């Protein structure tokens, strides 16, 4: 964290995430957070050189652990806002976007990124040999049925006009080919753009797990929720300021309204305390060039990204 002041009446926070992702069992910057860090450092250096021109004091936040969505929560819990001489009245953040060409900035008023919750469900059965199934309670059956039925929660219990994802992405059970295991463990995620929908899906997921266990004589040994991230809802009050800064940085013709997505971003945690706005900053080649997404081995940030990002961040302050 850092602070730059000019005795201004208001303080604005700027945040960059700094962590890498694990790829082939080693840390790599396959999501561009190194560029986010460099952007904020560049903005800090420029603003320091123009300190007497500041319209706002600036709180700089360099945040770890965005990828596992725990970093922002940890900073807030450890008194982030109290560490600055003046509490910020707003916070702004950026993330590169390979689908947008360099020189384009994506903005959106309202819900931009999903509320996200990861879940873990453990079904408990009774071990036994495959030759005597009547003496076993196989936890794989209810776990598999649970995974299949989850898709029905979205298709049959949410409005077709309401965006939601509810999916299983890992399934682990057993080590032998001739014995019923004791446990079957599933993990997955719920992502929505409305809090009410999110709460409904969590309740129904719990109901479904218990029903599948009962139908197959198992028990639900564990149902836990992990890595909750709130809805990232860009402030309507900040939108004019955010749009003006983007237009000043790249020209109004290069500012585009973007659709919401179901990715999770723990920048939303800060927005529980202060109004916030989050941008997409183009990092792709544009045109007909293939897009290498985040977390892929072909991911790269194109030249010119840093200039756009630094300009945007400084325009928010000067």
Locations of regions flagged by a protein language model:
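Metal-dependent amide/peptide-bond hydrolase catalytic core
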Residues: 144-318
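Histidine/acidic-residue-rich, glycine-tolerant segments that coordinate divalent metal ions
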Residues: 20-30, 34-35, 40, 47, ...
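A non-catalytic alpha/beta surface segment that caps or lines the substrate-entry region
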Residues: 1-6
């Amino acid at each position: 964290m850092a602070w730059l002041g000019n005795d201004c009446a208001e303080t604005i926070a700027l945040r960059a995430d700094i962590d890498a992702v694990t790829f082939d069992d080693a840390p790599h910057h396959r999501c561009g957070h190194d560029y986010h860090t460099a952007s904020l450092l560049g903005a800090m250096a420029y603003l320091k050189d123009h300190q007497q021109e500041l319209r706002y004091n600036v709180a700089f936040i360099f945040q770890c652990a965005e990828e596992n969505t725990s970093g922002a929560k940890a900073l807030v819990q450890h008194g982030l806002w109290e560490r600055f001489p003046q509490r910020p009245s707003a916070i702004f953040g950026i993330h590169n976007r390979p689908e947008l060409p360099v020189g384009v900035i994506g903005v959106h008023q309202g819900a931009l990124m999903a509320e996200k919750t990861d879940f873990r469900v453990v079904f408990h059965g009774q071990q036994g040999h495959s030759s005597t199934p009547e003496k076993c309670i196989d936890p794989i059956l209810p776990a598999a049925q649970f995974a299949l039925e989850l898709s029905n929660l979205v298709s049959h219990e949410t409005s077709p006009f309401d965006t939601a994802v509810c999916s299983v992405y890992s399934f682990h059970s057993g080590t032998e080919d001739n014995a019923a295991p004791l446990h079957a463990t599933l993990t997955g995620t719920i992502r929505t753009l409305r809090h009410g929908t999110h709460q409904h899906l969590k309740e129904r997921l719990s109901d479904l797990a218990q029903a599948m266990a009962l139908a197959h004589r198992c028990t639900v040994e564990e149902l836990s929720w992990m890595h909750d991230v709130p809805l990232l809802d860009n402030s309507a009050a900040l939108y004019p300021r955010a749009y003006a800064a983007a237009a000043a940085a790249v020209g109004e013709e290069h500012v585009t309204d973007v659709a919401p997505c179901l990715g999770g971003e723990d920048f939303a945690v800060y927005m529980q305390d202060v109004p916030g706005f989050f941008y997409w900053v183009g990092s792709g080649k544009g045109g007909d060039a293939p897009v290498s997404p985040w977390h892929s081995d072909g991911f790269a940030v194109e030249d010119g990204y840093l200039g756009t990002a630094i300009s945007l961040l400084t325009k928010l302050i000067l």
